[in-house]
Every structure is written in structure tokens, then in C-alpha cells.
Design a protein with these regions (language model features):
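FMN-binding flavodoxin-like domain, especially the glycine-rich phosphate-binding loop
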Residues: 3-6, 11-30, 34, 41-137
């Protein structure tokens, strides 16, 4: 199965990038930011993103729209300080592009200023590793 990993972050903390790189290490794949278009079809696109102003960043939307013909299914992995998931926002864009979005999702808290200090932490990454095992099955 061809799996690709793409992420977007604008945070100075780099929580989303850390999560994407962790996934890449565990799956033996390179995690690239969304400025890198897909070069070939991906049966599963692991999309690592974060909540910004109650939505996903426009870079995520542009990436999905620009690569819709190469994506067979999106798996949403996200973090936020607010505790809100990006699933609905990603689903809206996927629906517009006729890209299936897996019901499997991983969401974790992320630190921002004084909120959720130290997150994602070791326990979060352990849960993420367990989640990754479910998508490989």
C-alpha cells in the first residue's frame, strides 16, 4: 500500500512537525510539508495538521485541492491547544474534492503559551504509535 505523509505547521513550537516526523520514523517514510505535491498516487495520505482560528489553514485546503486526483483516502491526524479536532474542517474540503476521509482519526492536545504545557508528550506519542498500528492493518 502506498502511503504518503504531509503536514502543515506555522507554530514556532513545531508540534505538528514533531508528530509528522514521528509518524515517518515509525512507518519508514519521509514526512514532507504541504509545499511538496504528491509525485504519485497515494492510497492513504496521512495528513498531519492543527487547528488555527477554529479551522485548518488554507495551505491544507490548497494541498488537498491541488492533489485530489492522486489521493485515494485521507487519514486525519491533528493537534490543538483548544482541544478541538480538525476532522470536520478537513472533511468539508475532502467532500468538496470527492476525496474519501477515513473515520479513523488521531487527535491530541498541543501546548500553546501556558495551555497544555509539554504536550504532545510521551504518553501522546505512545497513543499515536498504537493508532498507527490500526491503520497498517
Amino acid at each position: 500500500m502506498k502511503i504518503a505523509i504531509r503536514y502543515f505547521t506555522k507554530s514556532k513550537k513545531g508540534n505538528t512537525e514533531k508528530i509528522a516526523k514521528f509518524i515517518g520514523e515509525k512507518l519508514g517514510l519521509e514526512a514532507l510539508d504541504v509545499t511538496h505535491p504528491l509525485e504519485e498516487e497515494a492510497e492513504q495520505l496521512i495528513l498531519v495538521n492543527a487547528m488555527y482560528a477554529a479551522n485548518v489553514d488554507k495551505a491544507i485546503k490548497e494541498f488537498l485541492r491541488g492533489n485530489k486526483d492522486k489521493i485515494k483516502c485521507v487519514i486525519n491526524i491533528n493537534s490543538s491547544a483548544s482541544g478541538s479536532s480538525t476532522y470536520k474542517a478537513v472533511k468539508k474540503v475532502c467532500d468538496e474534492c470527492s476525496i474519501p476521509l477515513s473515520e479513523k482519526e488521531f487527535h491530541t492536545a498541543a501546548s500553546w503559551i501556558f495551555i497544555n504545557k509539554g504536550r504532545p508528550n510521551e504518553e501522546d506519542f505512545k497513543r499515536l504509535e498504537e493508532f498507527l498500528n490500526t491503520i497498517k492493518e
